[in-house]
């Protein structure tokens, strides 16, 4: 007896993107790539798998990501601990060090691709999701911090988004954070009785992250904690003031958020998030900041850097809520045909039209004209090219508009095959 194979479903929190939504993804990525090119950013592609120690060192061993959320396994061939990337910055910095990219000049780079976190799936939070990661490596001044925020404001405008707001903070430099850390630990020790399990665990290892709590019982304690901003020295304040002045010059509104620390340990000086109320609990659309110590931390020569990451699924969700997105057509031209000779001719004509730069679907298989036209209309094609018996005999094609022109301009016309590509292209 043949055993019935139980069908396999996608892993929870790892979603298929089917042809309809995928077309919107492609349009979205086209906008994003054009936007990044306009600021001089070039694409890089790094592996999905990296050595686990890269993320433990780069992100921080006591972060939620490293402690709870990474997909990690042991390589059966050599015993190495490997991890599916939970974010892209560490891998891009690793690549810049390995390939000596910062030897002679700074670089503006970006990457688009999947990342993986072992989380409880919900709207806007998935186990496999996609990021747009943008990094400016080797740039030290607040002008590049400001440019990154301004370029994000431009992206929101390109996408027609309005309900996105900027939150801003400075984390200062390591020595300033050390002084603040000591004061913060004293504050947390005085409130140990109200700390939750995460708070008590992080009180000494990563006290700044305790303030980033979502626990309502700890909010008053967090609000009264010493502010890192009060510990900033002259250089850090000057950097932050320079950033704020440039944002004012660009007309960018923002809210100072002294509790904004981000979930990654490598940040210093500028940190920012773009947030919205339209995505429920997962309201952060984009987050980033400066990480001047990360290149050296991962074994390279000291080099400043700043970057951000956008969650693509969240931004696509927001885009689809904000504007009406036209579903892209499967093709421009759909060829219908009659008989075996018509089918063979259609295949040749399809290739000729593609040579001319047109997107073409040739109806597959044999069917009546009614069924073929139904499929042509469903494809979203503007024009149907008809190769019936008369057309095959006369070496012509009939052109029928499926959408677009009306009246006389929409009338069906017959043209010689030799002129077909030019006529179709003239119809734009």
From Swiss-Prot:
Q: What EC identifiers does the entry list?
A: 6.1.1.21
BP-aspect Gene Ontology terms: histidyl-tRNA aminoacylation
Which Gene Ontology MF annotations are present?
ATP binding; histidine-tRNA ligase activity
Gene Ontology CC entries for this record: cytoplasm
Which reactions are catalysed by this chain?
tRNA(His) + L-histidine + ATP = L-histidyl-tRNA(His) + AMP + diphosphate + H(+)
| Chief location bin | cytoplasm
Fetch the InterPro entries from UniProt.
aa-tRNA-synth_II (IPR006195), aa-tRNA-synth_II/BPL/LPL (IPR045864), Anticodon-bd (IPR004154), Anticodon-bd_dom_sf (IPR036621), His-tRNA-ligase (IPR015807), HisRS-like_core (IPR041715), HisRS/HisZ (IPR004516), HisRS_anticodon (IPR033656)
Recorded hits in Pfam families, A to Z, give:
HGTP_anticodon, tRNA-synt_His
Is Transmembrane helix there in the keyword field? Answer: no
The record's listing under PROSITE patterns reads:
AA_TRNA_LIGASE_II
Keyword terms: Aminoacyl-tRNA synthetase, ATP-binding, Cytoplasm, Ligase, Nucleotide-binding, Protein biosynthesis
Instruction: Please give the SUPFAM superfamilies that the UniProt record associates with this protein.
Output: Class II aaRS ABD-related (SSF52954), Class II aaRS and biotin synthetases (SSF55681)
Tell me where on the tree of life, at the top rank, the source sits. Answer: Bacteria
Q: Where in the cell is it found?
A: Cytoplasm
Stated family: Belongs to the class-II aminoacyl-tRNA synthetase family.
> Subunit structure, per the record?
Homodimer.
Q: Write down what this protein is called.
A: Histidine--tRNA ligase
Record the organism.
Bordetella parapertussis (strain 12822 / ATCC BAA-587 / NCTC 13253)
Taxonomy, top ranks, is:
Bacteria, Pseudomonadati, Pseudomonadota, Betaproteobacteria, Burkholderiales
**Chain's gene name:** hisS
């Amino acid at each position: 007896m043949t055993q019935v194979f139980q069908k396999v479903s996608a892993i929870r929190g790892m979603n298929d993107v089917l042809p309809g939504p995928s077309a919107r993804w492609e349009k979205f990525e086209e906008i994003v790539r054009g936007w990044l090119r306009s600021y001089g950013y070039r694409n890089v592609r790094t592996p999905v798998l990296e050595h686990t120690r890269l993320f433990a060192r780069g992100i921080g061993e006591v972060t939620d990501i490293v402690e709870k959320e990474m997909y990690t396994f042991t390589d059966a061939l050599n015993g190495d601990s490997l991890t599916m990337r939970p974010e892209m910055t560490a891998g891009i910095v690793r690549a810049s060090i390995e390939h000596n990219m910062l030897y002679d000049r700074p670089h503006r780079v970006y990457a688009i691709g999947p990342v993986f976190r072992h989380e409880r799936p919900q709207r806007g939070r998935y186990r496999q999701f996609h990021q747009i990661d943008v990094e400016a490596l080797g740039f030290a001044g607040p002008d590049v911090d400001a440019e990154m925020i301004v370029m994000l404001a431009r992206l929101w405008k390109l996408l027609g988004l309005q309900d996105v707001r900027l939150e801003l903070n400075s984390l200062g430099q390591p020595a300033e954070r050390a002084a603040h850390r000591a004061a913060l630990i004293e504050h947390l020790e005085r409130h140990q009785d109200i700390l939750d399990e995460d708070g008590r665990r992080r009180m000494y290892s990563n006290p700044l992250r305790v303030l980033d709590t979502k626990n309502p019982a700890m909010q008053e304690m967090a609000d009264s904690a010493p502010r890192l901003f009060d510990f900033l020295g002259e250089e850090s304040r000057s950097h932050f003031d320079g950033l704020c002045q440039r944002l004012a010059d660009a007309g960018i509104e923002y809210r100072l958020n002294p509790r904004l620390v981000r979930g990654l340990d490598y940040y210093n000086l500028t940190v920012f998030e773009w947030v919205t109320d339209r995505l429920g609990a997962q309201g952060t659309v984009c987050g980033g900041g400066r990480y001047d110590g990360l290149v050296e931390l991962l074994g390279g020569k000291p080099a400043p850097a700043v970057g951000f990451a956008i969650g693509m699924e969240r931004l696509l969700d927001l885009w689809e809520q904000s504007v009406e997105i036209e579903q892209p057509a499967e093709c421009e031209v759909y060829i219908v045909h009659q008989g075996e000779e018509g089918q063979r001719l259609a295949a040749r004509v399809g290739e000729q039209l593609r040579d001319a730069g047109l997107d073409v679907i040739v109806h597959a298989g044999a069917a009546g004209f009614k069924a073929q036209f139904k499929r042509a209309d469903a494809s979203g094609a503007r024009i149907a090219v008809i190769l019936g018996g008369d057309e095959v005999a006369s070496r012509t094609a009939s052109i029928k508009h499926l959408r677009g022109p009306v009246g006389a301009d929409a009338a069906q016309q017959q043209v010689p095959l030799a002129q077909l590509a030019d006529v179709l292209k003239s119809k734009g």
